[in-house]
């Protein structure tokens, strides 16, 4: 397992890149989560051992929304649209494992 950021880990299991998000209590889309997702998608694109990507969240919530604790500090790159564009442009099928 490789930590992409404090909140996102990268592993490959049975040929699938697994991006595991862990940002308690609700896996909000903080700067660290957005950055980790972007790094994870980029890493999976380059990883010949991965043929697909799964995004999974620890805990009981799958990405509850923006991290309101960051509102006062202003926008930080990467913005959500950059992360979504990387997911959209990925040549590998991507699945969100929502539980």
Residue ranges and their predicted role:
Residues 24, 90-92:
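Hydrophobic alpha-helix-in-membranes signature
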Residues 92-99:
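A short, small-residue-rich loop immediately preceding and capping a beta-strand
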Residues 1-58:
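Conserved CoA-thioester-binding segment of acyl-CoA-metabolizing enzymes
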Residues 42, 49, 56-89:
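Glycine- (often His-adjacent) and acidic-residue-rich active-site loop
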């Amino acid at each position: 397992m490789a930590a992409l950021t404090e909140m996102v880990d990268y592993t490959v299991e049975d040929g699938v890149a697994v991006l595991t998000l862990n940002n308690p209590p609700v896996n909000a889309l903080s700067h660290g989560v957005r950055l980790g997702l972007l790094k994870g998608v980029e890493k999976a694109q380059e990883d010949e051992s991965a043929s697909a990507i799964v995004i999974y969240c620890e805990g009981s919530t799958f990405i509850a929304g923006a991290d309101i604790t960051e509102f006062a500090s202003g926008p930080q790159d990467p913005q959500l649209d950059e992360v979504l564009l990387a997911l959209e442009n990925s040549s590998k099928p991507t699945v969100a494992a929502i539980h």
